[in-house]
Amino acid sequence: MSAIVDVIAREILDSRGNPTVEADVLLESGVMGRAAVPSGASTGSREAIELRDGDAARFLGKGVLRAVENVNTEISEAIIGLDAEEQAFIDRTLIDLDGTENKSRLGANATLAVSMAVARAAAEEAGLPLYRYFGGSGPMAMPVPMMNVINGGEHANNSLDIQECMIMPVSMGSFREALRCGAEIFHHLKKITDKKGYPTTVGDEGGFAPNVSGTEEALNLIQEAIAAAGYEPGRDVLLALDCAASEFYKDGKYELKGEGLSLTSEGFTDYLATLADKFPIVSIEDGMAEGDWAGWKHLTDRLGRKIQLVGDDLFVTNTKILEQGIDQGVANSILIKINQIGTLSETFAAVEMAKRAGYTAVISHRSGETEDSTIADIAVGLNAMQIKTGSLSRSDRIAKYNQLLRIEEDLGNTVVYPGKRAFYNLRSR
């Protein structure tokens, strides 16, 4: 038995300079697990609640001392003496202790920090790398990265309505080569945007935020950078979008202010279909607002056979909502954000449900990140085959990529890089 003997939480800073929760879990053997939780800017209304202090005198109300106190008192008292290897039981203890549907009493930032730290401690105690602790001894695949190279929407101060324009290297034989491809494209994109007179400052997730005229110009810049780096768009590198459509859905219309467009659900589907015809787009995240289920159904019926349609705000890593989507034939993929649900066990259940239904599961960071690299181990351990963890700058993003490099090295020739096979939910790829 790997008994928990102490649980300690503290307030640290995330990549945006906002407070977040870090937790240490100590076992009787002397082993310790440490984990820190992320925070989002564009959030779904049904996400688990991160507990903030609301004290305007500290961090503009964004302090997390209440969540820290909850870990150091109630949560600590509830799990000290439990076996760290019993992840599901510990997570259920946290859920029951909170007692709310959305973890609003203790805070999902409190429960998740502890859930992750328990897993790290248990893996260390077992002498296993975290990805093996999550996934067992079977064959594993490296994830294809979604690299957010141009930021818009809530992640940047520009006129681009679409929140993320991403590249996905798919023709390479290894994750290492895919990462090199992405980095080379990123550096060429910097040169191209600079030459065109755009600023090369970066957004929350490390991508550039040029004040482009619209989505097509952004994608053309990316395609130019892909070619300049010596790769072929559509063969070596595919494109992906995160619309974050809930952010510009107003009174039943999709208001793309940067492009001067006001579109119905059908009109926005046409807009996305046109982009997919012009560019090698393989994935569109949150292509409709979270509450526009009729729009989602229309989008899925129209594009779901050839485009990965990822539900983020739509599903918020919640199995109850995902089950509704599967039953109604809405989307064909789920974005997995550990802090949307608040425990690892619930996160893993969402991945399992998606796979059983033939949906893909994309493991994702948040716009407010830390140096914690747990999601890299989750992506490999659960054989998710896709990861979304930002651009090729900012150490909070690079921490995940570097961990994936270490994992690939550790696995050697037993691991595969799936490339286009990662899109097992599509029939025409």
UniProtKB/Swiss-Prot annotation:
(2R)-2-phosphoglycerate binds at residues 163, 337, 366-367, 388. PROSITE patterns: ENOLASE. Its cofactor is Mg(2+). It comes from the Bacteria. Belongs to the enolase family. This is Enolase. One of its GO terms (biological process) is glycolytic process. It comes from Azoarcus sp. (strain BH72). The active site is at residues 205, 337. It catalyses: (2R)-2-phosphoglycerate = phosphoenolpyruvate + H2O.
